[in-house]
């Protein structure tokens, strides 16, 4: 009798251990299902937002929306290439005569003597806006005297 009673206690303990383990597993599964439901909702919201951007009156299934988005992105990439191509091209071996037809001097639009632009043409651009220290500038002289005294 004692043996069966001890065995019964062990079975109850085992069941309790199993039931505790099962309940913790169930809790984790419910947490996972809740978070996957949240993820599914977020993905659904983002797909519907993407559908409104890509094809507001077209198909609403996920595959069609993603396919339309992919085609639209490819179209935008091509548009960027086309619009930026003129800025990326270099003049291939243009002769002096070909360049002179675009010259401002030939059109009478050059307002500054060319001799004064040599320094600007040879600079890297960063030093154009740097302050220049001259003997007349206050930064150059040790004791600055105001002309408004």
UniProtKB/Swiss-Prot annotation:
InterPro entries with a match to the protein in the record: bHLH95_bHLH, bHLH_dom, HLH_DNA-bd_sf, IND-like
Intracellular or extracellular location(s): Nucleus
One function term, GO molecular function aspect: protein dimerization activity
UniProt keyword DNA repair, yes or no: no
Entries under Gene3D superfamilies matching the protein: Helix-loop-helix DNA-binding domain
Domain bHLH intervals: 27-76
Coiled coil regions, renumbered to chain: none
Chief location bin: nucleus
CDD domains according to UniProt: bHLH_AtbHLH_like
CC annotations in GO: nucleus
Record's keyword terms, sorted: DNA-binding, Nucleus, Transcription, Transcription regulation
Similarity-based family: Belongs to the bHLH protein family.
Protein name listed in UniProt: Transcription factor bHLH153
Gene expressing this chain: BHLH153
């Amino acid at each position: 009798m004692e043996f069966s009673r001890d065995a019964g206690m062990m079975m109850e303990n085992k069941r309790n251990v199993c039931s505790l383990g099962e309940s913790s597993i169930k809790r984790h599964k419910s947490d996972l299902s809740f978070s996957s439901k949240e993820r599914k909702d977020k993905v659904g919201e983002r797909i519907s937002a993407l559908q409104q951007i890509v094809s507001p009156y077209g198909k609403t299934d996920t595959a069609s929306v993603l396919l339309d988005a992919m085609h639209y992105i490819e179209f935008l990439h091509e548009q960027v290439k086309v619009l930026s191509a003129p800025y990326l091209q270099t003049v291939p071996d243009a002769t002096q005569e070909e360049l002179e037809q675009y010259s401002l001097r030939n059109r009478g639009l050059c307002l500054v003597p060319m001799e004064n632009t040599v320094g600007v043409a040879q600079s890297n651009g960063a030093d154009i806006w740097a302050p220049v220290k001259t003997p007349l500038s206050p930064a150059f002289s040790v004791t600055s005297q105001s002309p408004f005294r």
